Structure formats: structure tokens, C-alpha cells
Amino acid sequence: MSLGPWEIGIIVLLIIVLFGAKKLPDAARSIGRSMRIFKSEVKEMNKDGDTPEQQQQPQQQIAPNQIEAPQPNFEQHYQGQQVQQPQNPQTPDYRQNYEDPNRTS
């Protein structure tokens, strides 16, 4: 299904009627600006994407030679010790500083 000259003319006429002749140049300008911004962002992303790959290659060569230090086992260290519990736990009284806003006195 191809568009002939009549169909294209009708579509252009509908766009002019819907958006108005005054708004079309502004819309075209804003679309052009958006495309330029989009292209510049894509270029920056491509630049940023190239540099980390180059930096990662030397790090990958160093990584196999590194040896991790053994981690201490904390369970064995504290296994023989008893945990001391507080003798008289006090529950706080939350009502001591509370003033009822609905109370009339």
C-alpha cells in the first residue's frame, strides 16, 4: 500500500488545519532541537562506552594474580563466652511527658 500524491496532500492539509499554520514552524524547530540534543547524547554515550572497556582490560589481567585473605570465623571466637543480660530492665513510661490535646482543664 503506497501513498499517492492525493493521500499525501490530504494528510498535509489535515496537519495544517489541526495545528495551524503559525504553530507548524515552531513545532518543526523544536523537533530539530530535540534531534540535535538526542544525537549529541548518543555521541557522548558512545564516547563514554569506549573508555571503560579500555580501562577494564588492565584490571582483568591483574585480578587472577590477587589472592583473597581468609576471613576470621567469628562464631568460633565467641562460642565459649556467655552473653550477659541486663539485671533489671526498665520499661520506659511514655505517659510521663504526654499531654492530652483533647483534655480540658
Swiss-Prot record:
Subcellular location per the Swiss-Prot or TrEMBL entry: Cell membrane
Compositional bias segments (type: Basic and acidic residues): 41-50, 96-105
Chief location of this protein within or outside the cell: membrane
Region annotation (Disordered) ranges: 41-105
One GO biological process term: protein transport by the Tat complex
Gene Ontology CC: one annotated term: TAT protein transport complex
Any GO molecular function: protein transmembrane transporter activity
Signal peptide feature range: none
Family per similarity comment: Belongs to the TatA/E family.
Assembly notes: The Tat system comprises two distinct complexes: a TatABC complex, containing multiple copies of TatA, TatB and TatC subunits, and a separate TatA complex, containing only TatA subunits. Substrates initially bind to the TatABC complex, which probably triggers association of the separate TatA complex to form the active translocon.
NCBIfam families hit by this protein: PRK00575.1, tatAE
Purpose of the protein: Part of the twin-arginine translocation (Tat) system that transports large folded proteins containing a characteristic twin-arginine motif in their signal peptide across membranes. TatA could form the protein-conducting channel of the Tat system.
Protein name per Swiss-Prot or TrEMBL: Sec-independent protein translocase protein TatA
Species of origin: Corynebacterium glutamicum (strain ATCC 13032 / DSM 20300 / JCM 1318 / BCRC 11384 / CCUG 27702 / LMG 3730 / NBRC 12168 / NCIMB 10025 / NRRL B-2784 / 534)
Taxonomic lineage: Bacteria, Bacillati, Actinomycetota, Actinomycetes, Mycobacteriales
Gene: tatA
